[in-house]
Curated annotation (Swiss-Prot):
Principal subcellular localisation of the protein: cytoplasm
Biological function: Catalyzes the phosphorylation of pantothenate (Pan), the first step in CoA biosynthesis.
Identification of the protein by name: Type III pantothenate kinase
GO CC terms, sorted: cytoplasm
Cofactor annotation: NH4(+); K(+)
Cofactor note: A monovalent cation. Ammonium or potassium.
Enzyme Commission number, as recorded: 2.7.1.33
UniProt gene name: coaX
GO molecular function: ATP binding; metal ion binding; pantothenate kinase activity
Originating species: Phocaeicola vulgatus (strain ATCC 8482 / DSM 1447 / JCM 5826 / CCUG 4940 / NBRC 14291 / NCTC 11154)
Active-site annotation: 95
Amino acid sequence: MNLIIDIGNSVAKLAIFDKGELVEVFRGSNHSLDCLPMLCSRYPLKRGIIASVITLSNTIRHQLERLPFNIIELSHETPVPVTNLYKTPQTLGMDRLAAVVAANWLKPGHDVLVIDAGTCVTYDFIDADGAYHGGNISPGMRMRFKALNIFTDKLPKVSAKGEVPMYGQSTETAIRAGVIRGMEFEMSGYITHLQKNYPELLVFLTGGDEFSFDTKLKSIIFADRFLVLKGLNRILSYNDKL
């Protein structure tokens, strides 16, 4: 069995895979992986991989050192089963790389746009030949709500929950619709633009806010909350065969 660890800006996700199948997912602090001893006792783990968008804490490094098996710390030097065309691979978020690896593995031979709606929203494109072309980063939903409140004098902090009209008729609904509809139109714009050159484009939607948009977008969307974890497992399996 494989141990997959994805440390994000907000939380850490730990997953167990058995022969390519996702068995269980755990969520916890991104500063300490206290559930590791429990996972090691519960599952016959043989190998692992970790990807992090933040600097690993000393606590986590010590916890990883005590694991009874080898664990790969994913970096731009780790072999991956796609061609990475990013000009500064050392600055590329490993979660973004893992997501396109998963998309290419799940839908081989297809042009794919991966939208990851988390702390930030990332748009990453991998073509049918498995070449990753790069992508863009924009503010995530919570970041947008927070920015409107912090960087203005009178705009209130608004919850994402509530009415989302096409045109806000109060400051609260104007902010909520501005953020959520704005993200919806942003996503649709990227999809429409890519479809001009890649008419058979497929779209994967993942991240903490993915299910806010999977039914709003008109294109065929594959919503997969665990896309990054699947990509990390694919990378681990690929390296195990080298």
